[in-house]
Amino acid sequence: MSVVEQYARAHIVSDADIAEDEAIPVVLRYDPDIDPRSVRVGLPGPHEWTFSRALLEQGLRAPAGSGEVRVWPCGRVQAVLEFHSPQGVSVVQFEQKALLRFLRRTYMAAAPVRG
C-alpha cells in the first residue's frame, strides 16, 4: 500500500493580528502501513496531530470529536479542525474540497488490488 501525502493551504482562526488572507501550508498524510485507520495533519513547525480517518470524514458532515481533535463543517465550502494540546488550542480552517480529495486518495491507497 502506498503513502498518501497532500499539501494544502489553511487559515489559522485567531483573534490575534493575523491577516485574514494569510494562509499557512499544511501537510495531510496517510500511511496505511503504519495505521490504516489514522491520518496526520502537520502544521508549520513541530505541530502534528494523528487522529482517526473516520473522525475527519464524519466531521465534514456534522460536528465530530470530543477529545484532542474536533472537526466540523463551516458553511457550505469550509471545514474547521480544532486541535487541543497542553500548550493550548489551534483552530484551523480548510477548504472542504481539499479534505475530501485527501480522503478519497486515502481510500484509493488502502483499496485491495484485484488481479
Residues covered by each model-derived region:
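Positively charged, low-complexity terminal tracts
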Residues: 1-115
